[in-house]
Swiss-Prot record:
This is Large ribosomal subunit protein uL6. It comes from Rhodospirillum rubrum (strain ATCC 11170 / ATH 1.1.1 / DSM 467 / LMG 4362 / NCIMB 8255 / S1). Belongs to the universal ribosomal protein uL6 family. The lineage of its organism: Bacteria, Pseudomonadati, Pseudomonadota, Alphaproteobacteria, Rhodospirillales. The keyword Ribonucleoprotein applies. Keywords: Ribonucleoprotein, Ribosomal protein, RNA-binding, rRNA-binding. This protein binds to the 23S rRNA, and is important in its secondary structure. It is located near the subunit interface in the base of the L7/L12 stalk, and near the tRNA binding site of the peptidyltransferase center.
Amino acid sequence: MSRVGKYPVTVPAGVTITVKDNVVTAKGKLGEMTYTAAGEVETRLEDNLIWVKPLSETKHARQQWGTTRARINNLVRGVSEGFSRKLELVGVGYKAAAQGKVLKLSLGFSHDVDFPIPEDLKITTPAPNQIEISGVDKQRVGQIASEIRSYRSPEPYKGKGVKYAGEQILRKEGKKK
């Protein structure tokens, strides 16, 4: 039995949910999102609770049960609170600046990296060595944060690079004489 799937998703005040043919649509103060659930599960809206139930006892149906419930929960949280991810730039001369629809990154290359800011996300730079990515879709926020981090992943000797806020970089010892 799924430990995640057996609990309902609570719909907060200010969020409107519609469920039709396993398509869940959520509207909130931050926007609107839609999720199409897998065919092996059934979704129902009762009062202010969204229940997810597997249609059969197959292994795949049980796998989709918890996944669907988690995705619907992220959908509801996204349109009500939103998601954000913070990145830190560590290194001499490493800096970022959001200019219009482009994020300019100086990461020690011979040129600046221009990263186009997607329409559905908001990217801010509270400090020259910090980037904050926020949006409605949890997967999209994490994907863009990962793409920005991949330009210069933290290296293990000095820890220079783009890292997630609070991330611990495994450090190595240098060569011994």
